[in-house]
């Protein structure tokens, strides 16, 4: 998956873009780690149980803070999944929305109208 100006999680009707006020230290405060290439990476389990079989939410922000990519993947991170298809994933959607709303509130991303 390539870095993009605006993106959405597979199946989500909401698109996000980078905020002009985004700062590197804000991403680090939210739990992003720096890769060897200088990009910022976020990788969290959406399932709040101790189980390692739940889907993962991943965001990678380019080092220039202009483009990014995000996805919900299988536990091993190899395949994107759509948590918006089935009603049984309501808790996962709620956890995803909570994380993204916190990032929007901290001026990392903006919702595209």
Predicted ranges, named:
Residues 60-113:
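C-terminal basic regulatory modules in eukaryotic proteins
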Residues 16-17, 21-67:
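Ser/Thr-rich, low-complexity intrinsically disordered terminal regions
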């Amino acid at each position: 998956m390539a870095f993009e100006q605006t993106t959405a999680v597979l199946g989500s009707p909401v698109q996000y873009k980078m905020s002009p006020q985004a700062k590197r230290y804000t991403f680090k405060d939210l739990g992003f780690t720096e890769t060897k290439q200088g990009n910022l990476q976020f990788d969290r389990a959406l399932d709040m149980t101790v189980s390692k079989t739940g889907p993962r939410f991943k965001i990678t922000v380019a080092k220039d803070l202009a483009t990014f990519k995000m996805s919900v993947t299988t536990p091993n991170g190899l395949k994107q999944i759509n948590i918006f298809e089935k009603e049984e994933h309501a808790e996962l959607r709620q956890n995803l929305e909570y994380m993204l709303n916190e990032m929007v509130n901290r001026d990392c991303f903006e919702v595209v109208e």
